[in-house]
């Protein structure tokens, strides 16, 4: 490819909504352009990187025995209503009607459709297992699309589905896919960690996420320093913390004028925040839920949602608080009257506390000397707090560490949730009917590209892993005015026939400094410079983007050296 012909219009000024580095660099390097909020057009450089990720995915998923198919993006509402997810997806689902008034959606995922599809022609145990996948666009009406390809409304995804006779068969398929995902992300040159995950709206009884480790990640990843435990923070039940304080005093109301936050109250009462109880009030579908955690803890909202089986999770409104007899800033379960569609739940650690302080449900007043197990009355008790850095590992008792990650893939053991709802059954060798046991397996293709940039960049631009770099090599003639320099660059370019589709010749009529700057921005793994040194000594300069290492070799040996370097980069997945 000649750089003069490459369609990659660079930007000098970036839009204000370009916050993360992948978004900034993909816009600046002319890799994509925003069409609407959350939707992007992929220009040649981004398209090539995306296609390379797809190629790796296909190679590894095909090894598992899965077969590629392609399913419709437009899906009828009926199949979603059978599983109950027409309502569950809520406003995130793009919904539309045809001219006859029939309801459809733009596919956010394909569990319903693939289950319906497989059930049409699969009825016997002799036809199982079935393993299929596709790579295509998905659509989710994100409330706040942001971070470029990290959270967009239209994105490219690989989604796979397996159908088995029993749990044992599913376990085998799950292991095959888990191992394939490990190979895929390794080949993409990513530093990642598989973690235990919550199944979310898709459902199922087991799930793992594959998280790319990056400071810009939206996910909090919990792992243990002493064992191999790792999980998304939302999927962890932390251990209950015992209380070593003993108190027999009766609870007492004290004046706390203007003290309406945990920090303010604890400072006013000269109390440790660990001896306070925090109240957070949610609206879970139609039910107002008062959640109580220790003052230094946060509520695990995903766990809370799962406990109540809620579709929508919002903060309670002022009207909700008033209806339930709650005074904002001074809330507690003590003395509350029973109200319809109102529930109280306390974290297990709270129920271990003694001599605590909490709200009194009156403005400017709090309780002290509270023993929640004694004073809170009939409340629901469960583990609803979020695990924190330094907590005890729930598996081995070691120390918990929390880092940031970008989810690029997830695997699920779905079980029979969809097959039962949609009638996907088979007959065993005795003629008895059973629901198929399903698994599903997703990879965010465009998100993988963005995550790679988040993990691999510096102040000058992108540092692509060679396997997914749009091009692997750029040849830069540093002196455009010299015909012999240009001729030498073209001859080297022509000689790279084994890598003809992976080499760019920067033949633009630009200064060498601009070419070098663009090469670093775009992130070519290898740059070959032919200039004054070649004219003076016959040597050319090879520079590695990742390490910054520069190697001088005779012109005649350049091709062989570049091929050697590329082979080494591929072998090391760098």
Task: Describe the role of every protein-language-model region.
Residues 75-79, 320-321, 507-514:
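Short acidic loop-to-helix transition motifs that present clustered carboxylates
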Residues 265, 439-468, 472:
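C-terminal, non-catalytic macromolecule-binding modules
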Residues 54, 111-119, 144-160, 168-441, ...:
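Extended, low-hydrophobicity, polar/charged segments
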Residues 1-98, 161-200, 297:
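TRNA-binding/sensing appendages of the translation machinery
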